[in-house]
Amino acid sequence: MVEKKPAVRSQDPGQRRVLDRAARQRRINRQLEALENDNFQDDPHAGLPQLGKRLPQFDDDADTGKKKKKTRGDHFKLRFRKNFQALLEEQNLSASEGPNYLTACAGPPSRPQRPFCAVCGFPSPYTCVSCGARYCTVRCLGTHQETRCLKWTV
């Protein structure tokens, strides 16, 4: 009879990596930076030749009805569009008395943070030892360890 090999994941729960609070925070910051850099998009018209031809529109709108005529203001808004970093730098250079994007913030919460399960969203009394994510039941813990623990979707 052929012996079955045990699954690598279920060999020994003591072999799972345990991260301290600082390592968890570094991991979360690295994941957030990767998300910030992930969706960066350049101008889709940048590589196309401009020989007086009309450039294609890369809009996802599927309007088959009447088309709205673009006004001159819309033309300049589309042509001289700025990215988020350029808008922040412009706002920092202009002196304004009121709160801006960098100075506006909410005060600390008056109540403690409510812990919710990372898998199903219900209130969770337990925390994963390895990564610090919350879970509510053994079933959610199993799902978390199989699919999410120490991966990009904590």
UniProtKB/Swiss-Prot annotation:
Xref: CDD domains: zf-HIT_ZNHIT1_like
- Residue positions of the PTM Phosphothreonine? 103
Q: Where is the composition biased (Basic and acidic residues)?
A: 14-23
Cellular compartment(s): Nucleus
Q: Tell me which stretches of the chain form a coiled coil.
A: 23-39
Q: Kindly give the PROSITE patterns that the UniProt entry links to this protein.
A: ZF_HIT
Tissue and organ expression note: Higher expression in testis than in other tissues (at protein level). Expressed in the lens (at protein level). In the intestinal epithelium, expression is enriched at the bottom of crypts. In hematopoietic cells, enriched in hematopoietic stem cells and progenitors with significantly reduced expression in differentiated cells such as granulocytes, monocytes, T cells and B cells.
Q: What happens when the gene is disrupted?
A: Conditional knockout in hematopoietic stem cells abrogates deposition of histone variant H2az1/H2A.Z to lymphoid fate regulator genes and causes reduced bone marrow cellularity and a decreased number of common lymphoid progenitors but an increased number of common myeloid progenitors compared with wild-type mice. Conditional knockout in intestinal epithelium results in intestinal epithelium dysfunction after birth with dramatic body weight decrease leading to the death of 30% of mice after the first postnatal week while survivors show obvious growth retardation at P30.
Stretches annotated zinc finger (HIT-type): 117-149
- The segments labelled Interaction with NR1D2 in the record are 72-110
Q: Where does Zn(2+) 1 bind?
A: 117, 120, 136, 140
Give GO terms for biological process: calcium ion homeostasis; chromatin remodeling; heart process; hematopoietic stem cell homeostasis; intestinal stem cell homeostasis; muscle cell differentiation; negative regulation of G0 to G1 transition; negative regulation of transcription by RNA polymerase II
Fill in the PTM field for this protein.
Phosphorylated on Thr by MAPK11 or MAPK14. Phosphorylation is required for MYOG induction, for deposition of histone H2AZ1 at the MYOG promoter and for SRCAP complex integrity.
State the GO CC annotations: nucleoplasm; nucleosome; nucleus
Motif Nuclear localization signal location, chain numbering: 38-47
The cross-references to InterPro entries, in alphabetical order and at most eight, read: Vps71/ZNHIT1 (IPR039723), Znf_HIT (IPR007529)
Give me the ranges of the annotated region Disordered.
1-73
Keyword Zinc among record annotations: yes
What Pfam families does its record include?
zf-HIT (PF04438)
Identify the main location.
nucleus
GO molecular-function annotation terms? chromatin binding; histone binding; histone deacetylase binding; zinc ion binding
Q: What family does the Swiss-Prot or TrEMBL record give for this protein?
A: Belongs to the ZNHIT1 family.
Q: What does the function comment of this entry state?
A: Plays a role in chromatin remodeling by promoting the incorporation of histone variant H2AZ1/H2A.Z into the genome to regulate gene expression. Promotes SRCAP complex-mediated deposition of histone variant H2AZ1 to lymphoid fate regulator genes, enhancing lymphoid lineage commitment. Recruited to the promoter of the transcriptional activator MYOG at the early stages of muscle differentiation where it mediates binding of histone variant H2AZ1 to chromatin and induces muscle-specific gene expression.
The name this protein carries in UniProt is Zinc finger HIT domain-containing protein 1
Q: Which organism is it from?
A: Mus musculus
Taxonomic lineage is: Eukaryota, Metazoa, Chordata, Craniata, Vertebrata
What gene is this protein translated from? Znhit1
